[in-house]
Amino acid sequence: MNTDTPTFEAQQVVRLRRGDLIRRLLQRDKTPLAILLTAAVVGTVTGLIGVAFEKAVTWVQNLRIGALVQTADYAILVWPLAFILSALLAMVGYFLVRKFAPEAGGSGIPEIEGALEELRPVRWWRVLPVKFVGGMGTLGAGMVLGREGPTVQIGGNIGRMVLDLFRMRSAEARHTLLATGAAAGLSAAFNAPLAGILFIIEEMRPQFRYNLISIKAVFTGVIMSSIVFRIFNGEAPIIEVGKLSNAPVNTLWLYLILGMIFGCVGPLFNHLVLRTQDMFQRFHGGEIKKWVLMGGAIGGLCGILGLIEPEAAGGGFNLIPIAAAGNYSVGLLLFIFIARVLTTLLCFSSGAPGGIFAPMLALGTLLGTAFGMAAAACFPQYHLEAGTFAIAGMGALLAASVRAPLTGIVLVLEMTDNYQLILPMIITCLGATLLAQFMGGKPLYSTILARTLAKQDAEQAAKSQRSVAGENT
């Protein structure tokens, strides 16, 4: 008798086990797989829209600058034209925001944080077109704003749009896809996938519900967004400052001093942003006409400023490599720094659709380079390179203002491809964050969200009082 031949009973047992395994697989909860697949869709769409937004803003800027170049020989025409073109473009952005989607004003990142806690609405059918077209207007006008805020808010709203289109009802999917879109948006803006992931984990840590599914979804969305960005824009770093030399160990104390300087500047900058917001609110009082005219005036002034001192206008990406290379004197760097602080306050605090990441990176570069050049003059024996302090300063102001040192470190290293500077970056950003916290500074985005929620509660209370008064009469 052949003992190797399986008996009929043994074959039956194998078939039953196989059928039971297949049945368990079919009955298994497919929610995690569905979330990961939709996260890939969110990341891909966010990457495509993010690239399209960048190209659209560049196209508008080129049209505006081209019109000015054609009239450059006629001073009587070029100055009024610079004001009018930028004013009209800015007014488009302000009008769309105020008329159709007030939550699309400003950076948009606090709105995503509020939505993650289900405290703010996500009206993607309004926010997506308003933020895209409005951002084209304000950024195309040459205002001192960045595109990362719009892409983060656009990404979060794409996450909610995909959720609605696929009719996914679970709270886990709603929260996860919103966070995935926001992370993919930051990655699409800066070609910085790891910074996009850290931004959600660190900056949105009070709101983000960390679990295996949510973090895998964020990873998936960021990967797809980064792939889309690199297909269209290549793999070069977004800011070309060249390969800088490493910082010698005996110079690291200088980076701690630089961090302490930014630890003082960060809370002061946040305070000025909030006070300027209050000033604008008192001026327009919520009236759309005043608000749009005010925005047009600010946009027009940025257009004029772009003719007088181009470095003081725009997001700042073109300024960063020039300043980091040491092409300006310390005095000129400080002058441009002060000018850009003022223009950043005017543009961002007025509620224009646009971010503040890029302007803060430029401000950090200016102050960091000025410090580096001064340190090189005071300590010639160290053979210091001002560019290394510029890189450290880029992340330090972001860390002190937003209170996200890890995001600031990784974002700058990914954007400049200077990973060898990670140690001075850590020292500078940690020093800036600790001193900012010691001085009582609050994270900028969290503070803006708290003010928005307080305003929302006040409006709801006033509405309730009016309805009660109407019933009594």
UniProtKB/Swiss-Prot annotation:
Site (Mediates proton transfer from the outer aqueous phase to the interior of the protein): 148
Subcellular location: Cell inner membrane
Subunit structure: Homodimer.
Placement of sequence motif Selectivity filter part_3: 355-359
Gene transcribed to yield this protein: clcA
Annotated site residues (Mediates proton transfer from the protein to the inner aqueous phase) in this chain: 203
Chain ranges on the Cytoplasmic side, renumbered to this chain: 1-32, 101-108, 117-123, 167-176, 202-214, 282-287, 350-354, 439-473
Reactions it catalyzes: 2 chloride(in) + H(+)(out) = 2 chloride(out) + H(+)(in)
GO molecular function, one term: antiporter activity
Taxonomic source organism: Citrobacter koseri (strain ATCC BAA-895 / CDC 4225-83 / SGSC4696)
Residue ranges that the UniProt entry lists as topological domain Periplasmic: 70-76, 142-147, 233-252, 310-329, 377-386
Protein's name according to its UniProt entry: H(+)/Cl(-) exchange transporter ClcA
Chain residues that bind chloride: 107, 356-357, 445
Intramembrane segments: 109-116, 177-189, 193-201, 387-401, 402-404, 405-416, 417-421
Keywords: Antiport, Cell inner membrane, Cell membrane, Chloride, Ion transport, Membrane, Transmembrane, Transmembrane helix, Transport
Stored Pfam families: Voltage_CLC (PF00654)
Main location (coarse class): membrane
Membrane topology of the entry: Multi-pass membrane protein
Transmembrane segments: 33-69, 77-100, 124-141, 148-166, 215-232, 253-281, 288-309, 330-349, 355-376, 422-438
Entry GO CC: plasma membrane
Motif Selectivity filter part_2: chain residues: 146-150
Function text: Proton-coupled chloride transporter. Functions as antiport system and exchanges two chloride ions for 1 proton. Probably acts as an electrical shunt for an outwardly-directed proton pump that is linked to amino acid decarboxylation, as part of the extreme acid resistance (XAR) response.
Family affiliation: Belongs to the chloride channel (TC 2.A.49) family. ClcA subfamily.
Motif (Selectivity filter part_1): 106-110
